[in-house]
């Protein structure tokens, strides 16, 4: 009788935050293959649908031992941050197979500049942008 009574009395109402996922946004073009070609640098973005306020942004930089990278690999994990009220941007950078250092660092900085320049479009508070990463991305 006690469990039945509690089930009737306790009602849990939770609303999932709604967010958008946009992939493949070109934020810059850069020389690739050591100056022999041009490459579009892209980012993936997870941002709340609610456009009534600005949100802090977390820029995610994936790892890959400097020789490979997949900016979309962790979007499922990063969506947890979006549920907590962050805009999350996963940025692409050139690897050591494509360009010499400091090219990867310049690419990440270009991504952050793009996010600041388009802060209104994605509901980003340009004064609250943080960076995190793993492996090579953590160094950048």
Per-range role (PLM):
Residues 99-120:
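Alpha/beta-hydrolase active-site loop
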Residues 2-53:
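N-terminal cap/lid segment of alpha/beta-hydrolase-fold proteins
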Residues 72-90:
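Short amphipathic alpha-helix adjacent to the substrate-entry channel of hydrolases
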Residues 53, 116-135:
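Gly/Ser-rich "nucleophile elbow"/oxyanion-hole loop immediately N-terminal to the catalytic nucleophile
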Residues 68-72, 98-99:
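Short N-terminal helix/helix-N-cap motif within the alpha/beta-hydrolase-1
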Residues 54-64:
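Short beta-strand element of the alpha/beta-hydrolase
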Residues 64, 87, 92-96:
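Short beta-to-alpha linker loops that shape the active-site pocket of alpha/beta-hydrolase fold enzymes
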């Amino acid at each position: 009788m006690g469990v039945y009574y509690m089930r009737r009395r306790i009602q849990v109402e939770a609303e999932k935050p709604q967010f958008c996922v946009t992939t493949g946004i070109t934020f810059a073009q850069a020389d690739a293959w050591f100056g022999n070609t041009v490459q579009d640098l892209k980012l993936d973005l997870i941002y709340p649908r609610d456009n009534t306020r600005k949100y802090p942004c977390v820029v995610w930089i994936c790892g890959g031992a400097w020789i490979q990278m997949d900016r979309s690999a962790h979007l499922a994990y990063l969506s947890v941050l979006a549920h907590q009220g962050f805009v999350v941007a996963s940025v692409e950078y050139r690897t050591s197979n494509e360009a010499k250092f400091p090219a990867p660092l310049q690419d990440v900085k270009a991504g952050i500049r793009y996010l600041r320049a388009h802060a209104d479009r994605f509901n980003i508070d340009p004064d609250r942008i943080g960076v995190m990463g793993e492996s090579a991305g953590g160094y950048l």
